[in-house]
Amino acid sequence: MQPGPALQAVLLAVLLSEPRSSKGRLLSGQLVCRGGTRRPCYKVIYFHDAFQRLNFEEAKEACRRDGGQLVSIETEDEQRLIEKFIENLLASDGDFWIGLRRLEVKQVNNTACQDLYAWTDGSTSQFRNWYVDEPSCGSEVCVVMYHQPSAPPGIGGSYMFQWNDDRCNMKNNFICKYADEKPSTTPSIRPGGEATEPPTPVLPEETQKEDTKETFKESREAALNLAYILIPSIPLFLLLVVTSAACWVWICRRRKQEQPDPTTKEQHTIWPTPHQENSPNLDVYNVIRKQSEADLTEPRPDLKNISFRVCSSEAPPDDISCDYDNMAVNPSESGFVTLASMESGFVTNDIYEFSPDRMGRSKESGWVENEIYY
């Protein structure tokens, strides 16, 4: 049975009897049925937020889950009825999906583009309300009902409520239509004798709330997983920081210990400073002062004279006997120089004898350093 003027009047009466907002208008998603319960029924889904609107397939699925289909407008009277619903919403700019779509078949030469469109709910109605230059039959396959109150009229007049083919991935509002049969309220009986409640239709608003809850739940689980990873790594990070700091301190101390002390370096110099050369407090002077005259003159049998022998001119340059020998005292003519007395073992600095052959160059190479042997 096609909706006629009588049905339009009934639906408008039902619309007036339905719950309304404080402004007295139809609510988005409100179910409007003939007589309040009889079908066909309609739901006009309008979103103020454009980001919440759906593409064609999403709108079709939302209607299907709610027990209906995208609306099939089969007569001009039904077209006017849908227009009244939308006007009563006081909706702003935003087109509405309807259940008309172009078939995915190759166009035959003698087939008009308009003839390739069919209703998704299986209706065979040939009623169309295209705008003057529509459909364009390009990449735009799905169909919307124009709703642009702010748009100026085009070359074919006002765009309002005219049909236009559009890309199926565009985001729009939509209209659902429910079957002509009376909805069943009697619970079904299972084979085991248990009664089951009829399925509760899922509204688009409820679906969005469920999707929001699922998204929030997934985000929370991801945050917990991240926390489970980061919390155990905090002690390891602190241990790494402490270990690095300890190693740095140890290396600094090691380098500081390896660096020579400037005061110690000055004490190890070979030549004493001029002030130290003339100082009467040197250890050697203190030792000499403690020696008595008897220590310097009396012999000591337990000590040997330590002598250096100067090489003669006949000896070869590499003769090791020219270096030094610890031998008994020889006459001064033999070329030995007595450095220590038998008594004290200190240098007397009295005798420096050289061989006659080396007298000529004694100033250059014959000098014997005074050493102290105790």
From Swiss-Prot:
**Glycosylation-annotated residues:** N109
- Membrane protein topology class: Single-pass type I membrane protein
Give the GO molecular function terms.
carbohydrate binding
GO-annotated cellular components: cell surface; cytoplasm; membrane; ruffle
Question: Which segments carry the region annotation Disordered?
Answer: 184-212
Q: Where is this region: Interaction with TLN1?
A: 330-374
Record key words, sorted = Disulfide bond, Glycoprotein, Lectin, Membrane, Phosphoprotein, Repeat, Signal, Transmembrane, Transmembrane helix
Signal peptide boundaries: 1-24
Q: Which cysteines are joined by disulfide bonds?
A: C63-C176, C142-C168
InterPro entries cross-referenced by the UniProt entry? C-type_lectin-like, C-type_lectin-like/link_sf, C-type_lectin_domain, CTDL_fold
Q: What is this protein called?
A: Layilin
Species whose genome carries this gene = Cricetulus griseus (Chinese hamster)
**Gene name of the encoded protein:** LAYN
